[in-house]
């Protein structure tokens, strides 16, 4: 006789995410000549969904997504070169974020704040997830 073990039913469904709201950086971005000569204010909003079943461990920072490190990396990446398009910048940010195995999905919104009069901002919003 074969004994079948049933999986223990979970009591909760977890969803974990790291959020970075309204990170404002002065960077070179855009296709126009005036955008290539002067930095402009760009706002970043990032939502990173992580593996909900990797539980945070106070003694191991690799068990979490460190938002301070993410802010630093976005700033460094954004200032590395002139980005012609926000779409190009967003792909570079996605590539950097998905190097962390804990990252499952990223929602990224990048906005130029002062570029078009009569608007608060213009920009892009993109979601990308691992398959």
Name what the model sees in each region.
Residues 1-131:
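N-terminal, polar/charged subdomain of small-to-medium soluble alpha/beta proteins
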């Amino acid at each position: 006789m074969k004994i079948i073990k049933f999986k223990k039913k979970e009591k909760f469904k977890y969803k974990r995410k790291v959020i970075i709201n309204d990170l404002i950086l002065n960077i070179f971005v855009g296709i126009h000549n005036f955008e290539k000569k002067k930095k402009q204010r760009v706002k970043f909003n990032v939502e990173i969904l992580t593996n909900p079943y990797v539980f945070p461990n106070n003694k191991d920072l690799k068990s979490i997504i460190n938002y301070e490190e993410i802010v630093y990396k976005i700033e460094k990446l954004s200032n590395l070169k002139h980005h012609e398009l926000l779409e190009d910048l967003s792909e570079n940010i996605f590539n950097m974020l998905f190097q962390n195995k804990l990252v499952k999905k990223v929602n990224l919104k990048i906005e130029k704040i002062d570029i078009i009069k009569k608007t608060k901002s213009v920009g892009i919003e993109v979601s990308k997830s691992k398959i």
